């Protein structure tokens, strides 16, 4: 039964990472400059999950295999007075869609809650087993 706890815990860690990436996307939704002031619109990130837990050498559970950068099209906004505008007056903004990020956050939350429920069920089973053995 402790394996079940490990599996659910790996999912909690993975979903927490996913939610952190989503929060970064939302926070950078309008960021068009790098930290040093150079023009480079932020690009949305997303988490790629993989089965297993390489830290434990287990084929069960889940882990974050990588955090990828979405190479999708940036969002052009007409701002002819901006120093970052192209020849046609457009400034490219991040490819972050607030609605998509909100749905992804909700999905991560539901997955997190489901794994908490699995942990609670496992703890209950362990408790009953200990009562029987005691």
Indicate residue ranges for each PLM-predicted region.
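Amphipathic alpha-helical polymerization modules
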Residues: 1-134
